Structures are given as structure tokens and as C-alpha cells.
Swiss-Prot record:
Domain of life: Bacteria
Main location: membrane
This protein's UniProt keywords: Cell membrane, Membrane, Transmembrane, Transmembrane helix
Organism expressing this protein natively: Brucella melitensis biotype 1 (strain ATCC 23456 / CCUG 17765 / NCTC 10094 / 16M)
InterPro entries: UPF0324_pro
Similarity remark: Belongs to the UPF0324 family.
Protein name: UPF0324 membrane protein BMEI1914
Gene Ontology cellular-component terms listed: plasma membrane
Transmembrane segments: 29-48, 58-77, 90-112, 117-136, 149-171, 181-203, 210-232, 242-261, 268-290, 300-322, 334-356
Length: 357
């Protein structure tokens, strides 16, 4: 019965994205990493206050400081394995909860005001970006499956898109690992540098929110990229990003049809195509739109969302291994960077075409 496992047999079984259940033993396991993330968050918030006191304003927000401090701790101190579960918990689940809470500050009227033109424009941006990114990858001699993973990761929702697409196209574990490794690094770089485009390009808060929603990899990372700019940017960026994430289902269906379902022996479940926190976000937005959330508690909900986001950014920094850039390979790196630049240009073109002020 034993047989040699071929490379083509090493296919990725996508993880389920339902909200995980917590037990006492799991809580014990996450405490070291969670405590470290909270400590870095506290330090980041103190440094932000020091900035405000001596410089008159916070040039680096606590969100950004938390990422930088977390990355520095990971690079210099290298926390041991016992911190990993808590770091992963903080970087993923806490950030997803922050997204859910953010829904309480957004009304459905904002979606209606966005208009059908923007919604169809987002779908067009995703389609064009995937095509261009795949073309760039193939021109740089990336294998077909690797090019698809990078294209979908860049154009839709980063690691989630990569994990969902992998079983559909029969991707090997090495391809998935390389794609995810560099996407994690590039995602942090985008969060840190994208706000610089506001003064550089003279973008309004509305324009920047749409740009962030169209270019930042993950829904939670949109919070980190837009929070230093304005609340309006946060709200618009999140809405645009949610629409972009919902493109994952149709895109996976298209690739499954193209591949003739030969490799789709493991089909992504509902919660992989539509993560639980997006459903939670929409539910909170509906409650807010129906005036079922008391106005008096909205500031507390918004503060909790912001605080959880900072903790998650600290954990995100703790999970960044700069050496992953080298291990990802030069062609993957160049493909991802060129694809991101193309995505930014396409997004700015859409903003200009729609006449967004």
C-alpha cells in the first residue's frame, strides 16, 4: 500500500475560516504571545504620546509604531515557539474582531451612495489586475500555478486568496509557501508606505480610502493603512475592500472551470470564500443602519476596534521574518512588486475615471 509521494501529490488542503472555539488549554497557550503583543502595543501608544508632546503631532501613529516595534523584536530577540500561538491569535482573530466592530460605525447608506459604478469598477479592477499580474509572472518565467497564486493574492485578498486558490489549481506546497511568505512581507510594506501617497499625489480622504481598499491585501490591513489618515478613509477603504474580497468566489469558479475541475478535488467551503468576519461586519453595519445600536456606546465600540487593531499590528510585526524575502526568490519578488505597482495604477485610473473628488 505504501507508495512514494510525488511532488504533484502535495496539494494544499485549505484551512477552515470559521471563528475558532476557545478552550482553557488554548487560552493558556496564547497568553505568552498575546501578552507580548499587548506589551508592544502599550509601548507604541506611549511613544505616540511622546511624539505628540514634543513634536506637536504624531508623525508615526501607534499602528505603525507597533508594526515597527514588533518587527524589531522579532529580528533582534527572536521570541521562542511558545509565543507563536498567541502571536498568531493576535494577528488573525483579534484583527478580524476589530473588523466586525468597525461595521458598527458604517451605515448602509454609505454603500448606496458609493453607487453601482464603483462596484462594477472594483470588479473590473480585480479582473484586469489578475490578468496583468499573471502575464507579468509568466513573462518572468514563473510556473503557471505560481503565477496564478501571486496574481490572485495581489489582486484579491493576499494569503486568503492564495490558500483558497491552491487546491483548485492543484498547487504544490512549495509554491504556496513561497507566495505566502513574500505576500506577508509586502503586505506590511504596503500598510506602512501607502499613506505617503496622500501628500505625494494630493489625494483627498475619499480618494485615498478607495485606493487603499483596491490595493491593500487583507481586509484588516485596510484599517492599519487608512486609520492614520482619516475615519472617512477607514470606512470607504473597508467597504471597497469587502466588495473586492467578494470577488474571490467568482474568480475561483472561473479557474475551476478553466482547469476542468481536474484539480478541484478539495473545494473551498463557504467560510473560505466568505470569511466569518465579513458576515459579522455586514451584520454590525445592518444593526447600525437600523439604529439598533445605541449611539452612546458607539465611541466605545470604535475605540475597542482601534485598540484591537494596534495589538494585531504588533503581532503582525512579530510574525514578519525579513529573511522570507530572500527565500521567496527573485522572480516571485519582482512579480509581486510589479503587480502591485500595476494594481495601484489601475486603481488610480478608476478613481480618475469615476471623477471621485
Amino acid at each position: 500500500m505504501n507508495r512514494k509521494i510525488r511532488a504533484s501529490d502535495r496539494k494544499i488542503i485549505p484551512p477552515q475560516c470559521e471563528m475558532p472555539k476557545m478552550t482553557y488549554s488554548k487560552i493558556q497557550n496564547i497568553l505568552p504571545g498575546l501578552g507580548l503583543s499587548v506589551a508592544i502595543t502599550a509601548a507604541a501608544m506611549v511613544l505616540e504620546k511622546i511624539e505628540e508632546h514634543y513634536a506637536g503631532r504624531a508623525w508615526l501613529e501607534a499602528l505603525v509604531i507597533a508594526i515597527l516595534l514588533g518587527t524589531a523584536v522579532r529580528s533582534l530577540a527572536r521570541p521562542g515557539p511558545r509565543f507563536n500561538k498567541g502571536i498568531n491569535f493576535s494577528a488573525k482573530l483579534l484583527l478580524e474582531i476589530a473588523v466586525v466592530l468597525l461595521g458598527a460605525s458604517i451605515s448602509a447608506s454609505a454603500v448606496i451612495e458609493a453607487g453601482s459604478g464603483l462596484i462594477f469598477g472594483i470588479a473590473a479592477v480585480v479582473a484586469v489586475a489578475i490578468t496583468l499580474s499573471y502575464g507579468i509572472g509568466r513573462l518572468l518565467k514563473l510556473p503557471h500555478r505560481m503565477a496564478v497564486l501571486v496574481a490572485c493574492g495581489n489582486s484579491i485578498c493576499g494569503n486568503s486568496a492564495i490558500a483558497a486558490m491552491a487546491p483548485v489549481i492543484g498547487a504544490e506546497s512549495e509554491d504556496v509557501a513561497a507566495s505566502i511568505a513574500f505576500t506577508a512581507i509586502l503586505g506590511v510594506i504596503v500598510v506602512l508606505t501607502l499613506p505617503l501617497l496622500v501628500p505625494l499625489l494630493g489625494l483627498s480622504f475619499t480618494q485615498y480610502g478607495i485606493l487603499a481598499g483596491l490595493t491593500v491585501y487583507a481586509v484588516p490591513q485596510v484599517l492599519a493603512a487608512t486609520a492614520p489618515v482619516s475615519l472617512l478613509s477607514v470606512q470607504l477603504g473597508t467597504l471597497v475592500k469587502l466588495v473586492r474580497v467578494l470577488m474571490l468566489g467568482p474568480v475561483i469558479l472561473v479557474f475551476a472551470l478553466i482547469s476542468g475541475n481536474k484539480n478541484a478535488d478539495v473545494k473551498p467551503g463557504f467560510f473560505q470564500l466568505v470569511p466569518w468576519f465579513i458576515i459579522g461586519f455586514l451584520a454590525m453595519m445592518a444593526l447600525h443602519s437600523l439604529h439598533l445600536i445605541p449611539e452612546a456606546i458607539l465611541p466605545a465600540i470604535q475605540y475597542a476596534s482601534m485598540l484591537l487593531t494596534i495589538i494585531s499590528m504588533a503581532a503582525l510585526g512579530l510574525g514578519v521574518d525579513i529573511r522570507s524575502v530572500a527565500s521567496a526568490g527573485g522572480r516571485v519578488t519582482l512579480t509581486a512588486i510589479l503587480s502591485l505597482i500595476a494594481l495601484c495604477c489601475i486603481s488610480l485610473g478608476l478613481i480618475h475615471m469615476l471623477g471621485v473628488a
